[in-house]
Amino acid sequence: KVIETFESMGLRFGRDVNAYTSYDETVYQVSLPTTQKQNLQQVMAIFSEWSNAATFEKLEVDAERGVITEEWRAHQDAKWRTSQARCPFLLANTRNLAREPIGLMDTVATVTPAQLRQFYQRWYQPNNMTFIVVGDIDSKEALALIKDNLSKLPANKAAENRVWPTKAENHLRFNIINDKENRVNGIALYYRLPMVQVNGEQSFIEQAEWSMLVQLFNQRLQERIQSGELKTISGGTARSVKIAPDYQSLFFRVNARDDNMQDAANALMAELATIDQHGFSAEELDDVKSTRLTWLKNAVDQQAERDLRMLTSRLASSSLNNTPFLSPEETYQLSKRLWQQITVQSLAEKWQQLRKNQDAFWEQMVNNEVAAKKAL
């Protein structure tokens, strides 16, 4: 019936109606093509039912087992195998290492409707929920709809949302991922470090410093590859990824040209050592700041044209991560003022902090185990 209701509004699953579950949250998203009160009321009624009165009929549960199992099987490729081989290193000492968000297939095959209902009643409760409405709708009207449909939901006792502290692995590790379907041979250095929780000006600056270091490395690496200075590397990147509510990983990866792992490893270590000794130039930093401020200013000037789904995603992220939500104008003005405190000296200190971090591991992705052993 829910599917029929959504389709009667012109909505399609996957395009307009979506949901996802990660390690830490479940998010339902509905994008309406109109703000007609009748449609809004119907959607709110569905959300109310999902929030308190979801059913777990045996036939539906059994059908969903097959859907989840097929989804799991469809992802058993080289990318998945690589992720599985990396997880013991990347997710060490986190609860995320125990299982993927999709769950364990033994559990999927055997869990009963009663167990699902118990889990749902423990976690999927209104007091664990944030409801976000974005669109061309009067805020008072939207608030009234929320109150009419959700305020009468019973305040059942929900499980406490605990944060399990991540313990550092303070020693260097080595990981070889050998898969015959890997298309490139590459080498990477991963660092694990506490997540910056942005709740004030100082943490705002610190997060920007980490982000700028990643951008500066990427910018320099790409310039040197394109100019032909780095002949043993065909590509590379630096990125920062969240690995737990309180922890992140910052990594540097390069792809070996002609599968020459030894030369690629030497090139990456040389690039890192150059930054160790000389850092980044004032010109490089000014260029990154200027580019970012231009992008932020464009966001201010183009607010009327911004994508509502992106805005919804930003609001959801702010709620899920318990961080302040800033408007484009606030973000631009705050960045313009606070980034003046970011200098090549402060970035050099942040870089040295990273490089002295012992919670790190080298990783090689290869399709030839002999090449990997030679490089190590």
Language-model regions: role of each:
Residues 1-31, 98-102, 215-248:
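M16/MPP (pitrilysin/insulinase) zinc-metallopeptidase core fold and M16-derived inactive scaffolds
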Residues 1-2, 189, 200-218:
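Active/ligand-binding-proximal structured segments within catalytic/core domains
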Residues 28, 88-129, 161-165, 193-203, ...:
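Histidine-acidic residue clusters that define the catalytic metal-binding segment
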Residues 58, 65, 117-148, 356-362:
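Non-catalytic, conformational "gating/processing" segments within enzyme and secreted inhibitor domains
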Residues 93, 130-185, 193, 369-376:
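An aromatic/glycine/proline-enriched structural segment found at the starts
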